[in-house]
């Protein structure tokens, strides 16, 4: 389990001494700027670079606590996610609540997870599987496309563009170098460095302000001049339905979790008050469509 962000869902085991035999979960994170993606032909190389780079960090870094070192070295858990999803959708001409958006996200995330798994499988062929591979569902030949909440099929048909059965066979034969591959972090700060939209979130405006210890930072959304009319702005969304569906389709493929949010603009409701029934409905829909975790429940000032 994680402390603040909610995307990490790794096993832990209590310890009573700093050098005890328990298990402290660590996850090595990275994100791919999908807003820069030109075609799915690039995804294989991008995922391979991300996985190989994080693979080297696991052995390179120092661990002050044995329980963290043993877990990380043996599980080699990675959490690769997205930044720039709003930019990517704007390039496709898709609003978050448009019916075609879930299909676009389905195709993107299938390519993403498939190529992450393929990269880890290739490294396992070179170096061997991770030490605790036999403790994973992957070792049984079980993939995320087998275990997702089937209610997602109401949103988008379970049609695939990649050869999952051959990948399943390769994983059972050679294993994976990493026990997990994907997790969606909030990425508020890292998106700024890459001049990308924040993670999987719709931007708050065309010129959102990122607060930091050194003061506010204004940053215009990518390709503002050409894509202004194609962006979904957070506080213009009438409700959370489209966003909930996007996250649900992503979670179908991710093997860890997603730090998803619920956002409310009080001006959309009578007396500037968000009804409890609306919030309860969002909670139930996230469960129905297979969200594993949620992060913030936030509102715009009325």
Q: At which residue positions do the language-model features occur?
A:
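Long, C-terminal-biased catalytic regions of enzyme "large/alpha" subunits
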Residues: 1-302
């Amino acid at each position: 389990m994680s402390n603040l962000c909610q995307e990490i869902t790794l096993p832990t085991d209590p310890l009573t001494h700093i050098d005890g035999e328990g298990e402290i979960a660590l996850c090595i994170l990275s994100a791919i700027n999908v807003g820069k993606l030109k075609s799915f032909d690039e995804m294989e190389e991008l995922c391979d670079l991300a996985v190989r780079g994080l693979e080297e960090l696991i052995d390179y870094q120092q661990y002050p606590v044995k329980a963290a070192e043993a877990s990380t070295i043996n599980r080699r858990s990675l959490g690769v996610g997205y930044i720039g999803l709003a930019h990517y959708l704007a390039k496709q001409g898709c609003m978050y609540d448009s019916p075609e958006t879930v299909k676009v996200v389905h195709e993107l995330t299938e390519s993403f997870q498939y190529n992450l798994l393929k990269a880890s499988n290739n490294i396992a062929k070179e170096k061997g599987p991770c030490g605790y591979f036999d403790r994973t569902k992957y070792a049984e030949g079980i993939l995320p496309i087998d275990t997702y909440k089937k209610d997602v099929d109401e949103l988008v048909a379970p049609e695939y563009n990649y050869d999952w059965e051959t990948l399943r066979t390769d994983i059972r034969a050679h294993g994976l170098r990493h026990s997990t591959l994907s997790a969606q972090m909030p990425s508020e700060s890292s998106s700024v460095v890459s001049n990308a939209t924040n993670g999987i979130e719709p931007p708050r405006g065309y010129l959102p302000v990122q607060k930091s210890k050194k003061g506010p930072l204004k940053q215009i959304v990518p390709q503002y001049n050409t894509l202004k009319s194609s962006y979904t702005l957070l506080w213009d969304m009438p409700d959370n339905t489209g966003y909930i569906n996007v996250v649900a389709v992503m979670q179908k493929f991710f093997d860890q979790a997603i730090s998803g949010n619920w956002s409310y603009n009080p001006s959309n409701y009578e007396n500037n008050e968000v009804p409890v029934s609306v919030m309860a409905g969002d909670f139930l829909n996230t469960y129905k469509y297979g969200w594993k975790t949620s992060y913030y429940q936030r509102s715009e000032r009325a």
